[in-house]
């Protein structure tokens, strides 16, 4: 009596290569979208800090009748803040660092907002996502 050999179970090399190729294609599409999503998620850190900084500057002006000497808000995790003040004007700039390099947002005493991002520049607004315009 002949014994039949047991069937070999498992994947062939071709099947594994096709699965790897499919995963690579999906990763190539998903990674840039994810990176864009993460960048957009970091932008509110800058805009919130600028808004809070503007309020602090206005409170200082109400107490002292000058913007000079007002404290600049502290740096965040992804943005560094810098202030320029005169007796009657101020500008607060949030400049991106690390993964947010290339992003810059400003606000002034008139609530004038500008932005410079890899996605485009906003002369009168803050650009928060790719394709936005003022």
Outline where the language-model segments fall.
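Membrane-proximal N-terminal amphipathic helix
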Residues: 38-66
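Periplasmic/extracellular, small/polar-rich flexible segments of pilin-like filament-forming proteins
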Residues: 55-134
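Bacterial Sec-dependent N-terminal signal peptides
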Residues: 2-4
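N-terminal single-pass transmembrane signal-anchor helix
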Residues: 6-34
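Residues at secondary-structure transition points
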Residues: 8, 40-44, 48, 85, ...
């Amino acid at each position: 009596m002949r014994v039949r050999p047991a069937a070999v179970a498992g994947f062939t090399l071709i099947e594994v290569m096709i699965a790897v190729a499919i995963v690579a294609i999906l990763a190539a599409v998903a990674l840039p979208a994810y990176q864009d999503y993460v960048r957009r998620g970091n932008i509110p850190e800058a805009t919130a800090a600028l808004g809070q900084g503007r309020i602090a500057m206005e409170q200082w002006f109400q107490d002292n009748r000058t913007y000079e000497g007002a404290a600049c808000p502290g740096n965040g995790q992804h943005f560094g803040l810098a202030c320029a003040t005169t007796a009657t004007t101020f500008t607060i700039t949030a400049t991106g660092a690390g993964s947010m390099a290339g992003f810059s947002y400003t606000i002034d005493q008139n609530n004038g907002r500008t932005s410079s991002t890899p996605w485009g520049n906003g002369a009168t607004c803050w650009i928060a996502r790719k394709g936005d315009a003022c």
